[in-house]
C-alpha cells in the first residue's frame, strides 16, 4: 500500500523511511472503551508496528474517568511504572511525559484524563522493542480486568450518570 493511494497525499513525506517512495505496511491493535457505568473510566490502548524502508513500534494507553478516584489514579500509574521498569527504568517517566503532552486539551486547558504512557518510533532493537510492546499489552489487559472487576457492578446515581454524559459529550 502507499500513503498517497490511501488518500493521504503528501503525509508520507513526514513518515520516517518513506523518502521518495510512499510504500508502507502497518499492523496494530486499538481498543477504545466507553462503559455504561460511570464508575468505570473510559480507557484507550493502542500498539502498532509500521514498516516503510525500516520499521518501528508505537503505542500507549490512557484512562479518562468521569468520576474522580485518586486510588485508581495512583494504582494505574503504579502498574504502568512496574511494566515499564521491567524493560528500562527511564521508560515510565519518558513515556508518561509524552502522554501528558500528547493528550493535553489546550482548548479546555486540561489533560484528557489521568494520563498514561505514549511512545512512538521505537526502533532500537526489534526483539527488545517487541517485548516492551507485548508487556504494554499484557499490562493493559490486567489493568482493564482489575478495573472491571472492582467497578462494573458498583451502583451509580443519576447525578453521576449526568457527569458521565457531560464528560463524554463535550
Located regions from the model:
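A short linear-motif detector with a strong N-terminal bias
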Residues: 3, 23-27, 41, 95-98, ...
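A broad, low-specificity signal for short, low-complexity segments enriched in glycine/proline
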Residues: 10, 19-24, 134-139
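Aromatic- and glycine-enriched beta-alpha-beta binding-site module
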Residues: 13-73
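C-terminal, helix-dominated tail/subdomain
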Residues: 162-170
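Single conserved hydrophobic/aromatic residue that forms the stacking wall/gate
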Residues: 1-12
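Long, contiguous internal "core" modules enriched in hydrophobic/ aromatic residues
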Residues: 55-157, 162
